[in-house]
């Protein structure tokens, strides 16, 4: 007997992927960021009321998305509360892969008189934060819990033992880390593996064609550690526009610097050739550079979310990736520039030992290529279905 194939997803967002080689949970290729959902920060970020937030969540979910990112700190807790209310009303909690974070001072505007232990990486902060997050999210478990940032006061041993306790008790399924130096992540994972504890499976941080620091240590570290990548800031936070377009009225996170102007012109040029948007090129860029990349896409407008979903079908050639790389100089720094760069060769993330010029003196080495990312439409082609 042959079982029927699952129905065709409504969009490319419904072709799910493995989160990382160390985390087998299935997630949509985009992660919906919810930092704008709430009233707590509307004076800074602009208004995104509950109806608008629910509309964004509904659009994402109905399009096949199941990967949603929140944090205890966002909007004074509104983001977690609203996502929790939405899941309760839609009765879809177990369909969602939900990530949240701890470490930030989430009680900043709370009634507590002494707030020193409501932040940090330590065990008490973790216990208080997770207890509060579970209540706000109206759930009894968190799929993916991130260390939001490293506090440089709590030991590796305390962090990993405390996190593993939550996993062992079923309150957390997978562990992630955000905004933390690569050497610390490797140290944490080495301690976890040596002691039978749960290591980090995902890294979240700032990465875009304008901010490529990720490519120095974080990206190689994730490849080596078997970790997925959930980059934020991929779309340039409204900065990836031509100078003319940026000068028009609209919400801006700040003035456009020269780097973003140059990249905006390059992305806009490519977008016109492909009949798409500059932000779509920016999204495709990071998803073409490494496997297990799940951009955290936020915002307040459904039409922008739909553009992000459509961009999953955008194909960039290796030459186009190089054009974007070369549009703005990037210094990978020592030792990678010493090992891989020459007057005629710039560092690329897909380089292997055959590209180390010092080792080519004695032999012409053949090496296995690095693992490649999933190609756009790969699932649709395999199952013989047309994209939507």
From Swiss-Prot:
GO terms for molecular function: oxidoreductase activity. GO terms for biological process: aflatoxin biosynthetic process. Keywords: NADP, Oxidoreductase. InterPro entries: AKR_Detox_Biosynth, NADP_OxRdtase_dom, NADP_OxRdtase_dom_sf. Coiled coil: none annotated. NADP(+) binds at residues 233-243. Pathway: Mycotoxin biosynthesis; aflatoxin biosynthesis. SUPFAM superfamilies: NAD(P)-linked oxidoreductase. It is an enzyme of class 1 (oxidoreductase). Its EC number is 1.1.1.-. The active site is at 74 (proton donor). Belongs to the aldo/keto reductase family. Aldo/keto reductase 2 subfamily. This is Norsolorinic acid reductase. It comes from Aspergillus flavus (strain ATCC 200026 / FGSC A1120 / IAM 13836 / NRRL 3357 / JCM 12722 / SRRC 167). The gene is norA.
């Amino acid at each position: 007997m042959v079982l029927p194939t699952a129905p065709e997803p409504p969009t490319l967002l419904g072709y799910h992927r493995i989160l990382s080689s160390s985390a087998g949970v299935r997630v949509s290729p985009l992660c919906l960021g919810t930092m704008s959902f709430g009233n707590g920060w509307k004076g800074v970020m602009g208004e995104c009321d509950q109806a608008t937030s629910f509309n964004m969540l509904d659009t994402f979910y109905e399009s096949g998305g199941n990967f949603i990112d929140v944090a205890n700190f966002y909007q004074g807790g509104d983001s977690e509360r609203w996502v929790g209310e939405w899941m309760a009303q839609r009765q879809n909690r177990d369909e969602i892969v939900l990530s949240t974070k701890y470490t930030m001072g989430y009680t900043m505007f709370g009634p507590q008189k002494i707030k020193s232990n409501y932040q940090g990486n330590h065990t008490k902060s973790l216990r208080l934060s997770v207890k509060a997050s579970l209540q706000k999210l109206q759930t009894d478990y968190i799929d993916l819990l991130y260390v939001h940032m490293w506090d440089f006061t709590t030991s590796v041993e305390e962090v990993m033992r405390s996190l593993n306790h939550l996993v062992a008790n079923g309150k957390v399924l997978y562990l992630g880390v955000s905004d933390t130096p690569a050497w610390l992540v490797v140290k944490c994972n080495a301690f976890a593996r040596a002691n039978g504890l749960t290591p980090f499976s995902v890294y979240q941080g700032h990465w875009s064609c304008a901010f490529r620091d990720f490519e120095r240590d974080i990206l190689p570290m994730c490849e080596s550690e078997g970790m997925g990548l959930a980059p934020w800031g991929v779309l340039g936070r409204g900065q990836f526009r031509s100078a003319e377009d940026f000068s028009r009225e609209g919400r801006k996170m700040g003035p456009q610097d020269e780097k973003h102007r140059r990249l905006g012109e390059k992305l806009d040029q490519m977008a016109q050739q492909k009949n798409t948007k500059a932000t779509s090129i920016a999204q495709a860029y990071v998803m073409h550079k490494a496997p297990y990349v799940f951009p955290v896409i936020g915002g307040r407008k459904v039409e922008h979310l739909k553009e992000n979903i459509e961009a999953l079908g955008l194909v960039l050639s290796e030459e186009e990736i190089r054009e974007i790389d070369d549009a703005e100089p990037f210094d990978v720094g020592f030792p990678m520039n010493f090992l891989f760069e020459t007057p005629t060769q710039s560092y690329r993330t897909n380089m292997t030992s055959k590209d180390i010029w010092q080792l080519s003196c004695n032999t012409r080495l053949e090496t296995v290529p690095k693992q490649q990312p999933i190609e756009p439409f790969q699932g649709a082609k395999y199952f013989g279905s047309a994209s939507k």
